[in-house]
Amino acid sequence: MLNFISKPVGCLKGEITVPGDKSISHRSIIFGAIAIGTSVIDGFLDGEDCIATLKAFQSMGVRIEGPDKQRVIIHGVGKYGLKQPQNIIDCGNSGTSMRLLAGLLAAQQFDSQLTGDESLLKRPMLRISRPLSQMGADVTTQDGKPPIVIKGGKKLNGIHYVMPEASAQVKSCLLLAGMYAEGQTKITENAVSRDHTERMLRTFSYPVQIQDGAIIIDCNGECHGTRLNIPGDISSAAFFIVAASITPGSDVLIRNVGINPTRTGIIHILTEMGADIRVLNQRAYGEEPVADLHIRYSQLKGIDIPASMVPLAIDEFPVIFIAAACAQGKTTLHGAKELRLKESDRIGAMVDGLNQLGVHAEGFDDGILIEGGSIQGGEVNSRGDHRIAMSFAIAGAVASAPVTIKNCANVATSFPSFVTTANMLHFQIEEYS
């Protein structure tokens, strides 16, 4: 078992980049694989989750070179060129891989099966199997959870689906199926979710309409190979945005971070708490906005986080809770029940961990209350969740004594270079088995 020890430090200073965006990396493989022609992807995240997606397409006959220095070259086989995999597709820890692949595989002429690790096998899949079934797909789960068994050769029909809650994975799953369905597939969102799939469709020249909160797609298009530069992942940058905000005297610059407006909840929330974050040198990598982020220490104050921020910061809440633990006053969050359905129950994991470190935190069914103060040293269990592990590693920098974090191997799913990058900013994080 891989564990971390994170020791208290003085100020954090320096300039870093973070690995490529995980959401965009997954999608670059998917669309590159079903495109006509070759795609060259730079900035690809070679973490375990995205490699699971890459290997899935290799098992379906797609030739993919790399990753080599974050470059991947995909020799697309077109929409109808995928071949039946010889084995069950193992998605590892990656819910994105499983849910997006399910939408694509539901439209193929061959049978397939998707499985994953112990954590993934506990995650809800009815949210995709039900609408896929409405489209005519034959998709079965084990009591609503993986593994997923898909019978191919089914004729899909477009549907109008109103999203019951914000979920980029469900939306993307249905858009991928809609690329093969007869008639229009229309997806209406009542709350904004990540729009990387819609942007990626445009990048690969596939026609998609976006109007009045709805996304419309049909089968009368093709993806075409392209060149793509992936920005740094704001979900990875989040750890250092918070770290610089809560560590006195800190001054940190993070270059080339994706600032897609469906992902910048962390900047809005921390700014409302009093953080000193400047967004510099705004530009675009293709369809995706990018900037450099300059963060300096500032005393934070507790706030009531609006529920409207939940889909815009869903993956960043664990480290936002660390910021709340260092703020003056109380921070509350409601409307975030989805946090209990991630790689771990993130509300439960953070409440337990914060209490272990002397911070008063209470969990609700859909949120949390945190009383800011000081973080003590101690030991926490990440529950095998990469974002919990990294969040408590950040806490160690400002704790009164070292923080030991157990069960950290899954950090490799999203940020394999986390410890190296952190220590460039003068963190003192050590790994041990």
UniProtKB/Swiss-Prot annotation:
GO terms for cellular component: cytoplasm. InterPro entries: Enolpyruvate_Tfrase_dom, Enolpyruvate_Tfrase_sf, EPSP_synthase, EPSP_synthase_CS, RNA3'P_cycl/enolpyr_Trfase_a/b. Pathway: Metabolic intermediate biosynthesis; chorismate biosynthesis; chorismate from D-erythrose 4-phosphate and phosphoenolpyruvate: step 6/7. The active site is at D315 (proton acceptor). It catalyses: 3-phosphoshikimate + phosphoenolpyruvate = 5-O-(1-carboxyvinyl)-3-phosphoshikimate + phosphate. Keywords: Amino-acid biosynthesis, Aromatic amino acid biosynthesis, Cytoplasm, Transferase. 3-phosphoshikimate binds at K22, S23, R27, S167, Q169, D315, K342. The keyword Transferase applies. It is found in: Cytoplasm. It holds the Pfam family EPSP_synthase. Monomer. PANTHER family: AROM/DEHYDROQUINATE SYNTHASE, PENTAFUNCTIONAL AROM POLYPEPTIDE. This is 3-phosphoshikimate 1-carboxyvinyltransferase. One of its GO terms (molecular function) is 3-phosphoshikimate 1-carboxyvinyltransferase activity. Phosphoenolpyruvate binds at K22, G95, R123, Q169, R346, R387. HAMAP family: EPSP_synth. Its EC number is 2.5.1.19. Belongs to the EPSP synthase family. GO terms for biological process: amino acid biosynthetic process; aromatic amino acid family biosynthetic process; chorismate biosynthetic process. It is an enzyme of class 2 (transferase). Catalyzes the transfer of the enolpyruvyl moiety of phosphoenolpyruvate (PEP) to the 5-hydroxyl of shikimate-3-phosphate (S3P) to produce enolpyruvyl shikimate-3-phosphate and inorganic phosphate.
